[in-house]
Amino acid sequence: MFDKGFKNEELVIRNERVRLGESKLIKIPLDRLATGTLIEIPIYIFNGNELGPTILLQGGLHGDETNSIELLRRMLIDKRYKIQKGCVIVIPLLNIFGFLDLTRNMNGKDVNRSFPGSKSGSLASRMAYYLMKELIQNVDFAIDFHTGGGQRNNYPQIRYTPRDDRGLALAKIFNAPLMFSSKLISKSFRNECHKNHIPVIVYEGGESLRLDEYAIQEGISGTLRVLKYFEMIAYIPEIKAEHKSIHLNKRKWVRAKVAGLFTATVTNGSPIKKGQILGNIVDTYGKTNDQVKSPVDGYVIAKNNFPIINMGDPLFHVGEP
């Protein structure tokens, strides 16, 4: 299922060569701040002593998705990338400008809607261009780490591309609590990699600008399971899963029928029954109380943590096995 024509005998990134048994930190200069400070994207390359697959681990494509950044940073600090076979390319923080501005986008542009990018386009487009130009030709598959946005908390989950057998296989190996197929989005990183026949799975866990220890640990454990499966690292006892991933076949958003103050009565990731009360919406004077009920038997995939809502706002993302 996975190609045996491995690419890690010698990788060339930014005119630097990384041979078998070598590890390097390569910095791609992106732009300067108005103060003249140079902004560089640090890329860590860990090439094992033996031929094997090359995997890209990418965090911070959206600058405010701190869990994605923290879990890759923590793996660096804990020296989890002791690679024996194959190569791991790690980008803990791609969207540095968004990170500095505490925002999802880069100068108003969504990097994940800017692929394949342009050498002379917007800053987001240029970042996408250099990522595709410098890295993708070296990669066999990738894990793209994200969190929920807009104060929506995603229960740890893996998303893969429909009808992509290799993506589905990777999702099963990762073994997050929840998994499901998700349609490709035009100009996204996953879509562009799909065009280049590179499978990408997306890990979602927690919400933007908030560290979530459970989401971080699930992301680390799933990543180690993938590395172990391909014999890139030695066995590590603590990566054994305590759960089997639940495969969801249908998903939908439960939206607010009225405006008001919202309170959830179920926890994220919990099993739910059709007709079960998931939360309540009251007006600011306590005169009305609208019960939010589940339309399906299934699980809570994501939960809105913002208390002030308007009609039509998403409250829960729910899925059916």
Spans of features found by a protein language model:
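Structured catalytic-domain cores with a bias toward divalent-metal coordination
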Residues: 1-321
